[in-house]
Amino acid sequence: GHEKSEYFATNIPGAENVCEWAKQINCDRIIFTSTIAVYGATEERATMREDSLTMPLTPYGVSKLTAEKIHIAWQKSNPAYKLLIVRPGVIFGPNEKGNVSRMVKAILGRYFFFTSNQGVRKAGGYVKELCESILFMMDYQDSKNEPTVLYNFTMDPAPSVQDFAKTIAKVGGVK
């Protein structure tokens, strides 16, 4: 994990720097990857809608929501600017080295066991699907001529931890 201060030291100046750089080079579109953590620590995050109340409870969620506001201010500073904000859940895929990759390694190595509620649903998605969704939403934004588009990205329905484990074991040939 990261120190709490690192989220603020990275996400807030990062947003400010990106917006300033975009102005300097006359870039008229920013795609910002935020997080569903802006909704708070709730198992219902997978069912949250884009207009759901944001109540981040972690430094990561707070810093990302603050960064969203910085990007929104950038967009509002010029009507020609376009902003696309995506709020993904846990993203997994090749070389991601996060929780899903650790779970795959543990299951394939036959040393995986559940330490929590197997029914907990994990909001998230595959990295290539996230990229495809961004391209789709850029086209949508252009077709509707919307200055700012914000959307959540998760599998629907969100699989449970047990669903993940069973699928990994099946694909990996582990019984």
Regions found by a protein language model. Give the residues of each.
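Conserved cofactor-binding/catalytic machinery of classical short-chain dehydrogenase/reductase
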Residues: 13-17, 29, 52, 66-67, ...
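Short alpha-helix in the Rossmann-fold core of NAD(P)-dependent oxidoreductases
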Residues: 8-15, 31-34, 63-64, 123
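Catalytic helix-loop patch of NAD(P)-dependent Rossmann-fold dehydrogenases
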Residues: 9, 13, 43-92, 96, ...
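Conserved Rossmann-fold NAD(P)-dependent oxidoreductase catalytic core, especially the SDR/UDP-sugar
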Residues: 16-59
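Mid/C-terminal beta-alpha module of Rossmann-like enzyme folds, strongest
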Residues: 140-175
